[in-house]
Amino acid sequence: GAMDIIQPDTCAAGGLTECRKIADMAAAFGVRYNPHVWGTGIGLAASLQLMAVLPPHTPPSLAPADPVFEFDRTEHPIRQAILSEPIEHARGVIRIPDGPGLGIEIDRAALERFRA
């Protein structure tokens, strides 16, 4: 095929429903789906929730591959600050937030600080 991996951004490619359709189409053609994640903790949480419901990618070798998730570590003052509990990784593992909705709670005071 023309590609082995696709990386749509959940927040820019139509949201959770559209990206699920993209992931299903990718799986039908044996293409790995890894979301591109850039922006705030809200987008990070959305992409994590999407990845949590996708079946494991099984490449042509028929050995299921562990999920790969882009986790940006560049300085970004807003990304984690707007979450009451930041999403972090430890030893290459990210805990998926398990609260209602996306699993996160927005820090409204932080939103006020960053409001233009």
Give names to the regions the model predicted.
Residues 77-116:
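C-terminal extensions of enzymes
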Residues 1-93:
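Shared catalytic-loop signature of beta/alpha-barrel
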